């Protein structure tokens, strides 16, 4: 009788342990699949015709006229396959105006989806989403503003970087770098001045701080909000791998808001396997923000994206 009871208890315990192990394995397999999908989307995004690998120029505008085209008399020279005279970008009183070249705009040039005409080009400070794009052939141009400086960003769907792309380098997924962090909101939210790689800076709201434990020590990271409609927290950070295997300036991490919102204490998951390089890792023509002092961690985050090599 006692043997039967013991056997039943043993089988019940073994069954629960097996079920628990199966559930953990299923959860791990699901997470691994999520990471694989994330990495596939990451590479696909970079390879879009207007993705970061398509950047071929960043031309800072000086007051007055800046002519653009493939002819040698232009201030900004495009490759020979593009129109000889594309247009003139006139900067005056913090306003960029598109003017036609002497022989008129080239056939097929559109601005914001409409045929090109003389017009003021919108260039919001440190937010390029609403700026109208000039499109012709494989070219994509638009004005950007960084503080009181204006530039012309030039993309080409047939850029050398796109043609040479051979994939990204990643650490193997490691669940040890997927941590639950304590979220503490700031009330009111504070503002940090973010420096950039091109020597400018801009203010960004910091809604709170995430505190987490890793390898027996506690660390803190402050995220910013990229824009008022953001649904993800944006962490700009640097760790000790930046000096060896990852991009030297910083890496980015996007993570959803805490389940109970930004304005209440709570928790959120920081999956450092999703750390990604900033655009500046792939092109010298980006204007990437740098991490605030508190986001430079004295720990090796051997997870996520590694240095990119052409």
Feature locations, PLM:
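Forkhead-associated
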Residues: 55, 60-129, 261
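Surface-exposed beta-loop interaction hotspot
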Residues: 135-202
């Amino acid at each position: 009788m006692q043997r039967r009871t013991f056997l039943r208890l043993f089988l019940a315990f073994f069954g629960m342990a097996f079920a628990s192990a199966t559930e953990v394995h299923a959860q791990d397999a699901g997470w691994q699949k999520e990471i694989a999908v994330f990495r596939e989307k990451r590479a696909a995004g970079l390879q879009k015709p207007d993705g970061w690998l398509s950047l071929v120029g960043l031309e800072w505008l000086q007051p007055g006229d800046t002519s653009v085209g493939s002819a040698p008399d232009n201030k900004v020279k495009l490759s020979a396959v593009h129109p000889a005279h594309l247009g003139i970008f006139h900067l005056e009183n913090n306003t960029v105006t598109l003017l036609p070249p002497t022989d008129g705009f080239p056939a097929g040039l559109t601005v914001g989806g409409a045929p090109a005409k003389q017009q003021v080009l919108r260039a919001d400070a440190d937010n390029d989403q609403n700026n109208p794009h000039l499109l012709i052939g494989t070219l994509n141009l638009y004005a950007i503003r960084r503080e009181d400086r204006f530039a012309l960003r030039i993309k080409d769907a047939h850029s050398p970087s796109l043609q040479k792309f051979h994939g990204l380098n990643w650490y193997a997924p490691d669940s040890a770098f997927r941590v639950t962090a304590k979220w503490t909101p700031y009330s009111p939210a504070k503002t940090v001045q973010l420096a950039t790689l091109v020597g400018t800076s801009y203010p960004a709201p910091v809604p709170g701080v995430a505190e987490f434990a890793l390898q027996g020590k506690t660390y803190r990271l402050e995220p910013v909000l990229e824009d008022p409609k953001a649904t993800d927290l944006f962490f700009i950070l640097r760790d000790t791998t930046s000096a060896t295997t990852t991009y030297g300036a910083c890496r980015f991490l996007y993570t959803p808001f805490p389940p109970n919102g930004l304005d209440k204490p709570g928790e959120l998951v920081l999956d450092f396997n999703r750390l990604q390089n900033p655009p500046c890792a792939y092109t010298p023509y980006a204007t990437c923000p740098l991490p605030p002092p508190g986001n430079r961690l004295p720990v090796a985050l051997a997870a996520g994206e590694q240095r990119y090599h052409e």
